[in-house]
C-alpha cells in the first residue's frame, strides 16, 4: 500500500500545471472560500468520491511551516505538554484528469518538541486515552511524524466510485529518565460507490483500519527520583498490580477498526448530507511478559451533518458527533504455567461525548473584493464513569463564535484576511473521584476545572500570494491564536508558513 501511495503522490507533484483554465489566485480563493466549503468540505472528508462531484477546481499546494505554542499556569492538556516547537512540511493536491476521473493526495512530515509533558509516556494520546503509560516525573518529548494518503476517483455515466488509502507513522522518545521510545503506525483503506440522480446523488462507502504501537521505557539510573510507571485506567485509577520501575513497562497496542457511511446531495446540489459510523478496538499487552493482555479500548463514533444553500450569498450547516469509549480490563492469573492468562474481563470505564454545532456563512461580493461573516454555536457534553472504586465526572459547555474575513485580487496579488472570536461557558458540571494516588486525583480535578471554566478564544490569519505567469504562485501565511481562561491561564499560538500553489 505504501508503494502505491508513493506512486500516486509523485504523480500529483509532477502533474502538468495547466489542468485548469483558472488562474492560481482564483483557484486559491475558491478553495479558501467558507461559502463554497459549506457541505462540500464535510462530504469530501467522509469520502473522496464526493470531492469529484464538488465544484472545486484542480489545485495543489506545498508549504513549510513553523508552529509555536506557549501556555501559562499549566497546560490545558498536560499529557501533550505546556509548549510546542514544531517544524513541518505539507503538500496536498486535487487533480481532475481526462475521462471524468481525478486523483488526490497529501503528504506530511513533522518534527517537534513537546515541552513538559506529564502523566503520559504514550504516543497518540488522544486516540488511546485513558489507557496510556504514565509517570510522575515527566519532561520534554521529541516527536516525529510521517503521513501519506492518496485517492483515485472516477465517474462513469451515473456511477461514481473511489479508492482511498492512508498511512501515518509516529516516533516519540525522551533522552533522559524515564526514557520512553514509542513507534506507532496507522493504516486505513476504503472504497466507495455512488449513484447520480437528475437532481442529486448518494454515495456509500466502507473501510478498514489497522493500528499498532510498540512502547519501551528504559532507565539509565533506576535509583533516581520517583521513576514508578503506572498503567493508567482512567479517572485517577491505574492497574496497581503492574506498577513498576521498568519491569512491566514494555507495552504493545494492537487495534483493528471498520467504518461505513453515506453522503449525498439534493435539490440540484443545494443540499448536502452525510452519516458515518466508525469502530476501533485496541488491545494493550505487556510485550515482555508473555503478551499479558491488560485491557481493551473500544471507540465508537457516529457523525452526521446536513447543509443547505439558501441563496448565492447565504448557507447553513449543522453537524453532530457522538463518541462512546468503553474500557474492558482483564483479571490476569499468577502465571503459574509461565504464561499470563486472562481469566476474567470487566467493563470498568465508559465515556460518552456529544458535540453539536450550527453555523452559517454570509458572503457579500463587491467589485473590490469579497466579505464573509461566519457565526456559529456549539454544544458539548461529556460524561465519564469508572466502575470501582466508583468515580464519575460530567460537564456540559455552550460556546458561540463570530468570525469574518475579506479577500481580494489585485493584479498578480491575492490577499486573504480572517479573524474570529469565541466565548465558551459551562452549563453544568459535577464529579466524584476516589483514587489511591493523590496526584492522579488532583490532575483529574484540574482537568475538570479547566474544562468548566469560561474561556475566550481569538484568532487572526493573513495570507499574501503572488501569481507567476498564471501557472504558479508563491505565498506566505501568518496565523495567531490565543485562549484565555481561569485565573490568568492562557494559551498562545503562532504559525508561519511559506509555500507554493499551482
Where on the chain are the PLM-derived regions?
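Outer-membrane beta-barrel translocator domains and adjoining extracellular loop/strand segments
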Residues: 72-79, 116-122, 173-181, 215-221, ...
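Outer-membrane beta-barrel "beta-signal"
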Residues: 24-27, 197, 490-502
